[in-house]
Amino acid sequence: LGTQGWECIAQRYWLHQVLDLLLAAIDTSGPLVGEPCDGDNLFAQMMKSGTTQPFVNALRTLQYLDANAADALWQTLFPAIWRTTQKRHQTDLNHALIGCVTHEYMLHQAPARPNVVQSLLGGALACSPTLEIPPYVLRYLGKTFQAWYVSMEQLQHQLFSLRSDDAVRESTQDALAEAYAELSEADYFYGLWRRRCMFPETNAALAYEQSGKFAEAQVLYEAAQVKGRTSGVPLTESEYNLWDDHWVL
């Protein structure tokens, strides 16, 4: 992903080619089944004597016929590769994936369904340990490539692994809140902000706004702004922007 250039086929679902290269690297001389099969019928005899070569060759051919099948295969194969990769190589692969999905030529994929970005993020989401993708990158990819679900799931996974005082945690919550707002997922938006806000006035104002009591909410947003400027209580820029935006609304 990081060393091969895909510009020449950027308008195609080029994971077909990636999968073909990966499957071609598999040692197909091994047995088809990991354990001996019981029985003397023809099927059992074929399983005992068979190798993985016909199976892998069939996969290489069939995945070219359907992008959805290739998408499903990638989301199965990539996590398996990730699990067996050494830690230092996982870091390299993580960086390569980020560089790939943020490349300008990927914009050709935006109208396609499925598209390469959706598949790459889906494969990353299934990995353990979780890949680390910058929150602003995930928000951009979700909006640009209609990968809302998988990008929000990835943000949530990353959020659980971050320390409460980590600056990245703040940006992750910002990206997740913006994604909820873009999709008009009001209850998720309010729930996230009510858990993370530092001022009780913010919590109460959000509760009023969620209940449709906008006049009461505006009073509390204004009170929070005054308190934030005068009290010396630690304040994040995100919470101040929330007051500003919602007080105007």
Task: Set out the residue ranges of the language-model regions.
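Eukaryotic intrinsically disordered, low-complexity segments enriched for acidic and Ser/Thr/Pro residues
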Residues: 1-249
